[in-house]
């Protein structure tokens, strides 16, 4: 079993039950899924760029990405409805905990001038969104093989009802928030 999953089952649930006075252990918020999205605007002119992004996203997450397509045509971007413009991966279960562990322990500390992640990036329903400016922070990405530095969005979806519960859940997992 994954290190974070064991920590959740042994320590985090008890701590959250005490802190928020839950009547049952089943009320404790859990991480439901993690969605990693990479928008590739350059894919409109050159579809090879999208293949590189898909390859990198697969290396980072260990799962084959879904190619996202444009919902609307936008003339100023020379974009037609249905054109491939990005890739996303939805992680659940074991892979989700592996990715979160790698993100917290390895990748975030590799960010340049890292002070911690924002405490305010919650959406009001207990979900946390994190923007990463470059894919090079992940150990699976080889610096020499990267043709363009791309960012990505990481959304951590929890079953928490409030942002405060979700913030506490993530900080119990070791998420480095701003002081």
From Swiss-Prot:
Q: Which GO terms describe its molecular function?
A: rRNA binding; structural constituent of ribosome; tRNA binding
Tell me which InterPro entries the record gives: Ribosomal_uL5, Ribosomal_uL5_bac-type, Ribosomal_uL5_C, Ribosomal_uL5_CS, Ribosomal_uL5_dom_sf, Ribosomal_uL5_N
Q: Which UniProt keywords apply?
A: Ribonucleoprotein, Ribosomal protein, RNA-binding, rRNA-binding, tRNA-binding
What this chain does, per the entry, is described as: This is one of the proteins that bind and probably mediate the attachment of the 5S RNA into the large ribosomal subunit, where it forms part of the central protuberance. In the 70S ribosome it contacts protein S13 of the 30S subunit (bridge B1b), connecting the 2 subunits; this bridge is implicated in subunit movement. Contacts the P site tRNA; the 5S rRNA and some of its associated proteins might help stabilize positioning of ribosome-bound tRNAs.
Q: Which protein family is it in?
A: Belongs to the universal ribosomal protein uL5 family.
Subunit details: Part of the 50S ribosomal subunit; part of the 5S rRNA/L5/L18/L25 subcomplex. Contacts the 5S rRNA and the P site tRNA. Forms a bridge to the 30S subunit in the 70S ribosome.
Annotated protein name in UniProt: Large ribosomal subunit protein uL5
Biological source species: Staphylococcus saprophyticus subsp. saprophyticus (strain ATCC 15305 / DSM 20229 / NCIMB 8711 / NCTC 7292 / S-41)
């Amino acid at each position: 079993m994954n290190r974070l999953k064991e920590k959740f089952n042994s320590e985090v649930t008890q701590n959250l039950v005490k802190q928020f006075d839950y009547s049952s252990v089943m009320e404790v918020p859990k991480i439901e899924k993690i969605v990693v999205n990479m928008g590739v605007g350059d894919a409109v002119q050159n579809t090879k760029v999208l293949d590189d992004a898909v390859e990198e996203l697969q290396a980072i997450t260990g799962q084959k990405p879904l190619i996202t397509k444009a919902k609307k045509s936008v003339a100023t971007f020379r974009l037609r409805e249905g054109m491939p413009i990005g890739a996303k991966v939805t992680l659940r279960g074991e892979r989700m905990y592996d990715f979160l562990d790698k993100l917290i322990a390895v990748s975030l500390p590799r960010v340049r001038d890292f002070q911690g992640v924002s405490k305010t990036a919650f959406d009001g329903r207990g979900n946390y969104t994190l923007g990463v400016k470059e894919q090079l922070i992940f150990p699976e990405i080889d610096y020499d093989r990267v043709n363009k530095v791309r960012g990505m969005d990481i959304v951590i979806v929890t079953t928490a009802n409030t942002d405060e519960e979700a913030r506490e859940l993530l900080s119990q997992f070791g998420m480095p928030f701003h002081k």
